[in-house]
């Protein structure tokens, strides 16, 4: 995060006629924690002065795409980043900046995967390049080596780090640079989450759940990080040994959804586990729950827990 000194001469020009446009980096704008946090801020900023545009890495549309475009944001679609696409992706990023030299602020939310964008932007003397730490560490898998390499080599290209917490900053930026990261709160609109008995009963009626039954809940992507398999094992044991009429609400989508559905069938819990998909009304669904479980392998500061 020491590149800012070399770019002082390349200042951001602010005019009253056009808003400052910030380029946000994401995989896809679905209803994940980081995505939802950015959208919470996006809805409340003065978009006549500051606009968010989004570089995503999936061709399919995300859950927030319509809202982004309605608020004046632009969405640019890149190819997914994989080891076999590095050269093609690097060329695509170079072409993007050839076509869009107007971006003077880059804000990445895809951890070390923003490496190629950060490097290209630094080479073009973009004055503000931010990486945002959202997780405390990465799971060990086939991509771990690449993640570790990019995490270390991206740091000189950054002008600033943002983080949701100290552990997340230390993991992405290292001990020394992590201390300089700016803590940005994972904000929510607290008014929407105030308890309301009428909403609780209404949601339970919609889900065909009685007012007296115990409802356990979880909100999160269906991926390895969120540890749904263990969550189901815990719920299965809870039903068997303590509360045979309990229900479980699973809110989210993801690549492991079919595997989780199969696990539900194996446990013979089809009538008690409700896969609700990605929902825009999580604040309402939370009202129906008595217990919230969150057994993730890793988190920075979860928006679901906030």
Question: Where are the model-predicted features located?
Answer:
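Donor nucleotide-sugar binding/catalytic pocket of nucleotide-sugar-dependent glycosyltransferases
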Residues: 2-6, 156-199
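A short helix/loop element that forms part of the nucleotide-sugar donor recognition site in Leloir-type
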Residues: 3-8, 93, 194-209, 265
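N-terminal strand-loop element at the rim of the active site
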Residues: 6-20, 24-32, 36-88, 255
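A conserved mid-protein helix/loop that constitutes part of the nucleotide-sugar donor-binding site
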Residues: 32-40, 214, 218-239, 255-261, ...
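Short His-centered aromatic/hydrophobic patch
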Residues: 108-114, 133
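Nucleotide-activated donor-binding/catalytic signature segment of Leloir-type glycosyltransferases, i.e.
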Residues: 261-277
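Aromatic "clamp/platform" in nucleotide-sugar-dependent glycosyltransferases that forms part
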Residues: 278, 297
């Amino acid at each position: 995060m020491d590149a800012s000194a070399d770019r002082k001469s390349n200042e951001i020009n602010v005019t009253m006629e056009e808003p400052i446009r910030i380029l946000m980096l994401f995989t896809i704008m679905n209803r994940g924690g980081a995505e939802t946090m950015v959208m919470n801020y996006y809805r409340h900023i003065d978009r006549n002065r500051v606009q968010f545009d989004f570089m995503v890495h999936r061709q399919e549309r995300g859950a927030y795409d319509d809202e982004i475009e309605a608020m004046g944001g632009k969405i640019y679609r890149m190819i997914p980043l994989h080891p076999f696409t590095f050269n093609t992706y690097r060329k695509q990023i170079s072409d993007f900046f050839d076509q869009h030299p107007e971006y003077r602020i880059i804000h990445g939310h895809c951890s070390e995967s923003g490496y190629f964008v950060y490097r290209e932007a630094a080479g073009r003397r973009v004055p503000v390049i931010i990486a945002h730490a959202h997780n405390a560490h990465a799971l060990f898998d086939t991509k771990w080596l690449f993640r570790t390499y990019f995490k270390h080599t991206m740091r000189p290209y950054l002008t600033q780090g943002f983080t949701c917490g100290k552990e997340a900053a230390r993991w992405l930026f290292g001990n020394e640079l992590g201390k300089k990261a700016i803590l940005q709160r994972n904000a929510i609109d607290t008014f929407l989450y105030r308890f309301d008995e009428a909403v609780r009963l209404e949601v339970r009626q919609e889900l065909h759940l009685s007012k007296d039954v115990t409802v356990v809940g979880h909100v999160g992507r269906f991926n390895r990080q969120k540890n749904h398999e263990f969550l189901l094992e815990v719920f299965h044991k809870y039903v068997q040994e303590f509360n045979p009429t309990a229900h479980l609400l699973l809110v989210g989508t993801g690549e492991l959804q079919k595997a989780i559905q199969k696990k539900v069938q194996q446990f013979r819990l089809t009538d008690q586990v409700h896969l609700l998909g990605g929902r825009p009304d999580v604040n309402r669904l939370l009202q129906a729950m008595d217990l919230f479980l969150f057994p993730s392998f890793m988190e920075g500061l979860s928006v679901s827990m906030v």
